């Protein structure tokens, strides 16, 4: 069984612990675990970490911050795609159309990167068949926490 270790990209000591752990793959996180105002610093920290450490053949899939800011998305992808990483995790994938834009942007910068869509909604789950058919994907990830927040399950009174 494989384990994937998510770690905030702004916390260097956690990245180093992950690198030295027995985990199968590291997911340095630029999304939920990093406050919005320091995401750019976290990206730079992650770049420095990857460039200045012996990665010991560790599989690394950074999770980008998927936002409405296309310039920020392209900055993350352009800077990460030239590093010694295996791929990128794309959070909040709901449909093939929006995923296609990110998929094509990543492939523009590095055609060899694995792209992992993170399904975190009912809409994303409903569209999973189209995502699988429409793209060359080897891995799909499921975010149960955000998904469960969207389910119509309220408190019992």
Which residues does each PLM region occupy?
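Conserved alpha/beta-domain cores
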Residues: 2-157
């Amino acid at each position: 069984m494989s384990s994937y270790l998510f770690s905030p990209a702004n916390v260097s000591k956690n990245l180093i612990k992950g690198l030295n752990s027995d985990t199968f793959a590291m997911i340095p996180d630029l999304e939920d675990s990093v406050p919005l105002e320091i995401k750019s610093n976290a990206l730079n920290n992650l770049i420095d970490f990857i460039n200045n450490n012996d990665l010991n053949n560790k599989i690394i899939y950074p999770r980008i911050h998927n936002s409405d800011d296309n310039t920020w998305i392209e900055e993350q992808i352009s800077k990460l795609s030239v590093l010694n990483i295996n791929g990128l995790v794309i959070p909040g994938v709901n449909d093939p159309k929006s995923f296609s834009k990110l998929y094509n942007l990543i492939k523009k910068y590095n055609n060899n990167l694995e792209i992992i869509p993170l399904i975190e909604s009912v809409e994303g789950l409903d569209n999973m068949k189209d995502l699988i058919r429409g793209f060359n994907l080897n891995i799909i990830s499921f975010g149960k926490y955000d998904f469960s927040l969207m389910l119509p399950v309220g408190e019992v009174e």
